[in-house]
Amino acid sequence: MSAIENFDAHTPMMQQYLKLKAQHPEILLFYRMGDFYELFYDDAKRASQLLDISLTKRGASAGEPIPMAGIPYHAVENYLAKLVNQGESVAICEQIGDPATSKGPVERKVVRIVTPGTISDEALLQERQDNLLAAIWQDSKGFGYATLDISSGRFRLSEPADRETMAAELQRSNPAELLYAEDFAEMSLIEGRRGLRRRPLWEFEIDTARQQLNLQFGTRDLVGFGVENAPRGLCAAGCLLQYAKDTQRTTLPHIRSITMEREQDSIIMDAATRRNLEITQNLAGGAENTLASVLDCTVTPMGSRMLKRWLHMPVRDTRVLLERQQTIGALQDFTAELQPVLRQVGDLERILARLALRTARPRDLARMRHAFQQLPELRAQLETVDSAPVQALREKMGEFAELRDLLERAIIDTPPVLVRDGGVIASGYNEELDEWRALADGATDYLERLEVRERERTGLDTLKVGFNAVHGYYIQISRGQSHLAPINYMRRQTLKNAERYIIPELKEYEDKVLTSKGKALALEKQLYEELFDLLLPHLEALQQSASALAELDVLVNLAERAYTLNYTCPTFIDKPGIRITEGRHPVVEQVLNEPFIANPLNLSPQRRMLIITGPNMGGKSTYMRQTALIALMAYIGSYVPAQKVEIGPIDRIFTRVGAADDLASGRSTFMVEMTETANILHNATEYSLVLMDEIGRGTSTYDGLSLAWACAENLANKIKALTLFATHYFELTQLPEKMEGVANVHLDALEHGDTIAFMHSVQDGAASKSYGLAVAALAGVPKEVIKRARQKLRELESISPNAAATQVDGTQMSLLSVPEETSPAVEALENLDPDSLTPRQALEWIYRLKSLV
């Protein structure tokens, strides 16, 4: 029998718990009891496993022992962080009634729900990463996708047209929590993600969504946000907003707009491309040796998060890019002065979100005050920068002198963590608070005077006056002198070596002091809440200021990186093409212990495809990736690692570089490779940058070469994308002779005996050999195996000396001339014994052979 079914048999307190738990059946309930949050039944069992805490039992209710686990209330943030990191959600239930006046159990209420996508507490968030709540919706026309960063108020929606685009969006945004409809069809897209939340269909209803959003923004329609004609995106956004309100249990004033993200506004990169380019995460899942690790020397967490958003969404609007370039150029002489001041601003963006949610702690307000104190110096430094965009940022960041003055008067220099600890509001801010504090603080002087007086009166030299939280004020006398205690001393507590007493005068003073402390704390909490009321009317301007400060941090950082790492400003041109002089890989050049060999690149409508050959470890993949990374950096407005760069319009970047078996989906390396290749061939355009590395490796030589040839042909002749095509099939070096717009380049190496030296320098023309055996020897393959391989190589070369030669009949190569399969009719004839056939059987065979031809 379940606890709910046997409800009346439980104690009143457990009945209260079960009612609250029934409202939140799928998540853990932290039920406040004194100094602990308790969990019962299945919640206790789950929590003990997830948090590695003891599972105990609490007496019995309805005749059964109740499984129980508990955590101290003062350490709750640490436990919440562990649960959130595991994708769990928690309902926090607090005591809101007064135990002294309560009849029966103290009144309790769920005051907030902590979920992976709706956290705003500093202790639970990764400070340099966005933490997104997302919702996904699907109908016959495509997908709707919405994301909300509750720690900043940034609200976005999009309408991915197909599965590949939706997968790329999920990879880019990487939500901490994802809401989906109960009838969502493409479960394979989202399976395996943490923080999945199944929601009822009605939460995605379009009319409800419009109503919710208009109510949130105080508008009559959504035309002004540019999302009116995005029904799928709005369905997702409506569900997401409702969920955020339900979990926060408060208004969300910092969410004041919603933005549509359109494919045509940014360079599209699919999930494979983001992974292969190692933008913010390397192939092993870490953050080391990524593009972000090189570019991100921002000095504020909000600046770091903005830079990563830029890296994952390169913009195509050249006006925005030229403005960023101009700003970076103007700031290069000011980075040393600006960065130390910007560092002091801190994470104003997330502090403002906690202010809006009314969960900001005293130290948040102290940090906000410290940020305001930096603004006059920042504005003074920026005043001399000759740049219109910089001056626009300067105006947007504001000064907030009144708010700075308010917080300087209201909050002490170093406040405690929590307002309930008291001592947050500064002396002199409120006269009544100062009076109550004076009364409470006067206790020390009074107790000292009382102790001296009573010692003199009683003649007891061991007498002393003290206080503890359990018994309050007391007079303590040692056990040896306790028999001499005056008659008006009433025993309060007996210790091993002493007795503690109370006298009417001390009891009266205790009541007075405790009353004054309680009143001081209650007034302090009230004044603290009133500070929110004084700050929140300025929320919109404060959010604009935080955004401007984050952008300034990013641009100052990019200016510093450009100067320190010797980057150059790229030039944007109107026609498709990329021309790079002395290009370098931004990450590899930082980790090498030797000088990086810079290389040129020239792609244009007349030279659309480069067939890249050369040895393994020769630098082909590095050369290809550096081209994509230089293009990506140019399209966030950054300077780039090269001597000179001219770059035309790019709509998408595709990479087919390396692969591993996708065991979870049951796909082989070759299947993964072909899936990515199919995506490229379906979606690339003449404005796309395509990197193709070693297509066709996972199958037979003939199949692989055939596929590689056909893919290259399609990209060069039909799609006409800007393509870097690395291959070990030397037969493909014949392509430039057969198609216009295709050229050969190679990376060379020098062999000397058993050693090989890689030149890492890109040269025109095809490579002369692949150096595969030399690389194998370098890798430590046994000498006898290498020796045998050389013998076999000579045999094969003597058998087919012209394997790569072109045949007379047009574009077909000899290696592609796969022997025809034997006809079934021929096989049948070969197996036939004519001497054993009767005339009738012979006639039947003639008809059978006829059917096989």
Curated annotation (Swiss-Prot):
A biological process from GO: mismatch repair
Q: Which key words tag this protein in UniProt?
A: ATP-binding, DNA damage, DNA repair, DNA-binding, Nucleotide-binding
Q: What InterPro entries is this protein classified in?
A: DNA_mismatch_repair_MutS, DNA_mismatch_repair_MutS-lik_N, DNA_mismatch_repair_MutS/MSH, DNA_mismatch_repair_MutS_C, DNA_mismatch_repair_MutS_clamp, DNA_mismatch_repair_MutS_core, DNA_mismatch_repair_MutS_N, DNA_mismatch_repair_MutS_sf
Please tell me where ATP binds in this chain: G614, P615, N616, M617, G618, G619, K620, S621
Gene3D superfamilies hit by this protein? 1.10.1420.10, 6.10.140.430, DNA repair protein MutS, domain I (3.40.1170.10), MutS, connector domain (3.30.420.110), P-loop containing nucleotide triphosphate hydrolases (3.40.50.300)
GO annotations of cellular component type: cytosol
Identify one Pfam family in the record.
Answer: MutS_I
| GO molecular function terms attached to this record | ATP binding; ATP-dependent DNA damage sensor activity; damaged DNA binding; mismatched DNA binding
**Positions of transmembrane segments:** none
Family indicated by similarity: Belongs to the DNA mismatch repair MutS family.
Explain the purpose of this protein.
This protein is involved in the repair of mismatches in DNA. It is possible that it carries out the mismatch recognition step. This protein has a weak ATPase activity.
**Which NCBIfam families would you find in this protein's record?**
mutS1 (TIGR01070), PRK05399.1 (NF003810)
Q: What is this protein called?
A: DNA mismatch repair protein MutS
- Source species: Shigella flexneri
